[in-house]
């Protein structure tokens, strides 16, 4: 009987706290929407470890507010005890991608050395930073690189992506273009380019809006290019977590 009573009380308390949390979130959403009509659509409101401070997630961005939505704070929270960037850690979690779920069959694949480590790159054939990154990746050993072509920069990017993808040895053609500037031969005849469309859909799903964008085995994603030493560091770290 006592056990049943304790269980009932615990459930009642849990329901009370849940209702209070929902009411607080609703108040914050309401006040921000009414007071800031141009405020972006809110995806989540979560209580933080700091009393009275709430996290507001807008897509992959984080801002903070008080319990009434009276103030909005932009910036990163640093835990001075651990020197941990709490905000960045949260963003890393939000933006993480399940590496195992990526459709690698739609990627151009090349490797160096054993290829035991893996890296995904979203790239546009006209992306200057992608070319620099591809060139510098020659310094990184024992890695397999999966490149998803996403022609998002306009101009002749779609044509170049098609020419590369349809080449018999698209990995060699891709690297020759990115590193040496040797244009891919024009694609002639029938070629299934639906993979390129799927890549664009996937990029939109994961909110990849610029190139290059990197994804490591542990799901960590990095917008933009990294120098070889930092790529190496991230590859080692991702193998430890994957």
What kind of region is each of these model predictions?
Residues 2-7, 16-162, 176-179, 187-210, ...:
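Extracytoplasmic thiol/disulfide redox context detector
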Residues 10-12:
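N-terminal low-complexity, Ser/Thr/acidic repeat segments characteristic of secreted
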Residues 59, 217-218:
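Short strand-coil-strand connectors
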Residues 214:
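Short, flexible loop motifs at catalytic/binding sites
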Residues 220-223:
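Structural signal for short hydrophobic segments within the conserved structured cores
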């Amino acid at each position: 009987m006592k056990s049943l009573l304790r269980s009932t009380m615990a459930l009642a308390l849990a329901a009370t706290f849940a209702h209070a949390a929902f009411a607080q979130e609703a108040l914050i959403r309401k006040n921000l929407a009414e007071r800031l009509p141009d405020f972006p659509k809110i995806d989540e409101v979560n209580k933080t470890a700091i009393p009275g401070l709430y996290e507001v997630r807008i897509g992959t961005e984080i801002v903070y507010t008080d319990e009434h939505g009276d103030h909005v704070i932009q910036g990163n929270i640093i835990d001075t005890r651990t020197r941990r960037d709490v905000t960045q850690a949260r963003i890393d979690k939000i933006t993480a991608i399940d590496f195992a779920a990526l459709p690698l069959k739609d990627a151009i694949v090349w490797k160096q050395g054993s290829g035991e480590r893996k890296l995904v790159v979203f790239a546009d054939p006209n992306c200057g930073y992608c070319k620099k990154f591809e060139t510098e990746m020659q310094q990184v050993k024992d890695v397999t690189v999966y490149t998803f072509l996403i022609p998002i920069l306009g101009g002749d990017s779609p044509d170049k992506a098609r020419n590369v993808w349809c080449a018999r040895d698209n990995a060699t053609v891709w690297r020759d273009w990115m590193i040496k500037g040797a244009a891919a031969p024009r694609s002639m005849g029938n070629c299934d380019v639906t993979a390129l469309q799927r890549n664009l859909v996937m990029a939109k799903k994961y909110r990849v809006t610029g190139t290059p964008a990197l994804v490591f085995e542990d799901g960590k994603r990095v917008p933009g290019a990294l120098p070889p030493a930092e790529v190496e560091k991230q590859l080692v770290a991702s193998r430890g977590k994957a």
